[in-house]
Swiss-Prot record:
Gene symbol of the encoding locus: FEY
GO cellular component, one term: endoplasmic reticulum
Keywords per UniProt: Acetylation, NAD, NADP, Oxidoreductase
Sites where the protein binds substrate: 199
Name this polypeptide is given: Dehydrogenase/reductase SDR family member FEY
EC number: 1.1.-.-
Membrane-spanning parts: none
Single GO BP term: regulation of leaf development
Residues that coordinate or bind NAD(+): 61-85
Domain of life: Eukaryota
Entry keyword Signal: no
Length: 376
């Protein structure tokens, strides 16, 4: 009888997921069209404009606030008494808006406490410099609203000056870098909030952490893939940040859908789709309607309680607020915690931050970033 033992064959390695499955894809598009067709019905209980609680002591940073949802968000927060920092690429346009708003507000109360600071989300160096300048004030930040976004529908693939696909940088990488770098100010402002204006389009998104620029050839690039992937990446990164921030910091992280809104993002649509936007106003929110979920997430007193409940329940994704200002559940792929962890690590690598950046900032330590004045 032979003494040799027969070894069992090693299991074949699991096949790497290349894209959404058909059922996931169909459920995703069902969510998209459901929001388009029924958002007015589901949000019919909301007032327009949305009444806000007292925000007199809040300092709020709103990116992309010279047009669309961001413009309405900044204006309404300022009129409600908040100190608003318009974080924008075009500071001249922001200053003109501030002057206009001050004139319109004249005689209604104290002058609006609003200012403009320059930031360009297509430049990570600009993002880091903005954070450095804001943190240098040594004041509190109570609400960061990552509102700026882009959807260059139909355009060929383009890259930022750092070499990253433009949707991924503007919609995910730059807001992620800004959120982490502003943690010192957010902790000073505790209880505080990071609000990410996301989209129901994340439901049809898929992220390959090894190919976030969609250049490997495994997937054919389209602007739709670029946009939806960036929005899913933002939720995944936010979900890990949600887990890493202890309750003691008092910093909440929320993603939201504003609904389908007639904004300057529509300027990037094809002429046919722009025409459709014009003829179906019943289905499309105005910017004033679209900003309600942003304002709700930024100011409602129940948000920190909801955030704490999800943390205590070890919920796998960060809080997500729908266009009707109710809690919602992101897509099935957004719950993929393994991919989310890889997206977290890859994002920090791409934006030039150490893997322990959040932990160090919570402890009050300094960190090194590949971008900004400190790297000169």
């Amino acid at each position: 009888m032979s003494d040799e033992t027969t070894s069992s064959p090693s299991p074949a390695p699991a096949k790497k997921k290349q894209n959404l499955g058909w059922m996931e894809w169909m459920r995703g598009w069902s969510s998209v069209f459901g929001e388009i067709l029924f958002q007015r019905i589901t949000a019919s209980h909301l007032e327009n404009p949305l009444p806000l609680p007292s925000v007199n002591d809040l300092t709020c940073v709103v990116t992309g606030s010279t047009s669309g949802i961001g413009r309405e968000t900044a204006r309404q927060l300022a009129e409600a008494g908040a100190h608003v920092v318009m974080a924008v690429r075009n500071t001249k346009a922001a200053q003109e808006l501030i002057l206009q708003w001050q004139n319109e507000w004249s005689g209604k109360g104290l002058p609006l406490n609003i200012e403009a600071m320059e930031i360009d989300l297509l430049s990570l160096d600009s993002v880091a410099r903005f954070a450095e300048a804001f943190n240098a004030r040594l004041g509190p930040l109570h609400v960061l609203i990552n509102n700026a976004g882009m959807f260059a529908m139909g355009e060929a693939q383009k890259f930022s000056e750092e070499g990253y696909e433009q949707h991924m940088q503007v919609n995910h990488l730059a807001p992620a870098l800004l959120s982490v770098l502003l943690l010192p100010s957010l902790i000073r402002g505790s209880p505080s909030r990071i609000i990410n204006v996301n989209s129901v389009m994340h439901s049809v998104g898929f992220v390959d952490p090894d190919d976030m620029n969609v250049v490997s050839g495994r997937r054919k690039y389209s602007s739709l893939i670029g946009y939806s992937s960036s929005k899913l990446a933002q939720i995944m990164f936010s979900s890990i940040l949600f887990k890493k921030l202890p309750l003691e910091t008092g910093v909440s992280v929320v993603c939201l859908s504003p609904g389908v809104v007639l904004t300057n993002v529509a300027r990037d649509l094809s002429r046919i789709l722009q025409a459709l936007y014009a003829v179906i106003p019943y289905f499309i929110f105005s910017p004033q309607e679209g900003c309600r979920s942003s304002l709700f997430s930024a100011t409602d007193p129940q948000i920190p309680e909801y955030w704490e409940t999800l943390k205590n329940d070890d919920w796998p994704v960060c809080p997500f607020i729908s266009q009707d200002c109710r809690p919602a559940n992101p897509s099935e792929e957004a719950h993929n915690t393994e991919t989310a962890q890889r997206v977290w690590k890859k994002t920090l690598e791409l934006v030039g931050l150490p893997l322990d950046a959040v932990e160090k900032l919570i402890e009050g330590e300094n960190i090194q970033c590949r971008y900004g004045a400190q790297h000169e």
